[in-house]
A protein has these predicted regions:
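Helix-to-loop junction immediately C-terminal to a conserved catalytic motif
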Residues: 50
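Conserved ABC ATPase "signature" region
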Residues: 66, 108, 112-130, 179
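ABC ATPase NBD coupling module
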Residues: 67-82, 112-113, 186, 226-229
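Conserved ABC ATPase signature
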Residues: 135-139, 143
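A short, proline-enriched helix->beta-strand linker immediately N-terminal to the Walker B motif
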Residues: 154-158
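Catalytic Walker B motif of ABC-type/P-loop ATPase nucleotide-binding domains
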Residues: 160-163
Length: 245
């Protein structure tokens, strides 16, 4: 059974259909990448997974239960499906350590000592423990990304979803984040990632989903999508900028 199963997902904003019958599955331990042109519905799809955006119709099953139901405990769902935002969403007035421990203390009701221990574990795993007393403004973009990931992992989610994790990073930092994703994947962390970056996508996942105008048009390796797919729009998207070797 898939950890997350999306069936016929539709999201409309007034008369504008952003997602139009999306179907996909995410398996335990899988790292799934979603790509597509700007405005195709990628970020909206992620936000539907933990009800940051309410679907218009369709179902999203998490561990076999439809989480679009009105009876769903949305707060518990958001602890199970962690979200790492494009701009990291760190609290500027809190240290790195306190950014990670805040939800542990407020939502999981951990003592400060317990929360500090958990935060130290996650920050150490991401090579950020030496920065635990710094403030976000003292960190590089890549370091901020690691703090945001540590904060999500500290809640022990079943899935972590990432919205454009490399959009604010230079090429060196992008490689570092790719290495981090691969390490987390080896640790059996289940992830779904939206990205516009073909090189990054190739570094972290064999296959990608292509979303266009709210519809899943294809799922395959970037190489096959760029050269062998029957849809010219798909070939053009994945063959752009010489990203296919």
């Amino acid at each position: 059974m898939a950890l997350i199963e999306v069936r016929n997902l539709v999201k409309k904003f007034d008369d504008h259909t952003v997602l139009n019958g999306v179907n996909l599955e995410l398996l335990q331990g899988e790292l799934k990448v979603v790509m597509g042109p700007s405005g195709c519905g990628k970020s909206t799809l992620l936000r539907c997974l933990n009800r940051l955006v309410e679907p218009t119709s369709g179902t999203i099953s998490f561990r076999g239960t439809d989480i679009t139901s009105s009876s769903t405990d949305v707060l518990a769902l958001r602890q199970s499906i962690g979200f790492v935002f494009q701009q990291f969403a760190l609290y500027r007035h809190l240290t790195v350590g306190d950014n990670v421990t805040l939800a542990l203390r407020k939502l999981k009701k951990m003592s400060r000592a317990e929360a500090n221990e958990k935060a130290a574990f996650e920050l150490s795993r991401l090579d950020m423990i030496a920065h635990q007393h710094k403030y976000p403004e003292q960190l590089s973009g890549g370091q901020k990304q690691r703090v945001a990931i540590a904060r999500a992992l500290a809640m022990d989610p079943a899935v972590v979803v990432f919205d454009e994790p490399t959009s604010a990073l230079d090429p060196v930092m992008v490689r570092e984040v790719a290495e981090l994703f691969n390490r987390l994947n080896r640790d059996n962390i289940t992830m779904m990632c939206v990205t516009h970056d073909l090189l990054f996508a190739r570094q972290i996942s064999e296959k990608v989903i292509f979303l266009d105008q709210g519809v899943v048009r294809a799922e395959d390796t970037i190489e096959r999508l760029a050269t062998n797919h029957p849809d010219a729009k798909v070939r053009e998207f994945f063959g752009r900028e010489g990203h296919v070797s």
